Amino acid sequence: MASTAREIMTGGVECIGEDETVLDAAKKMAELGVGALPICGNDERLKGMLTDRDIVVKVLAAGGDAATTTAGSLGQGEVVTIGADDSIDELCRTMSKHEVKRLPVIDNQKLVGVVSESDLAAHATPEQVVKVVRGVYGDD
């Protein structure tokens, strides 16, 4: 059974540049069949995560223009990450504590992958999955 984030993550993750538009991000999400993209700066460092929900709620529903709004303008605050060699238990604690559905995986200060709920469901114990679901979505 897998024991580290590196073992269950989806690798080869593509970033959206912080200066690229939200429209570009939406097209890339559709092309890749994903619901979120890491936002990377010109220095290749992780700046945030952009989700399809961010695009709908923070741009479209707010009357913004997806063709002019940059991905970087939506990736605010501190990015929650996990180390590639951190345990699945630590990964579950981090997802629960920060109520996140996707967790970027960092190795030597570089993005190497992302762990999603589906990665977790495929590789974690049922107890670990329940812990994350309760942390992210509540006990109700």
Task: Give the role of each language-model region.
Residues 54, 73, 119:
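Ca2+-coordinating acidic residues in Ca2+-binding motifs
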Residues 59-60, 124:
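Flexible, gly/ser-rich surface segments that form the specificity/activation loops bordering the active-site cleft
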Residues 118, 122-125:
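C-terminal structural segments of small proteins and small subunits
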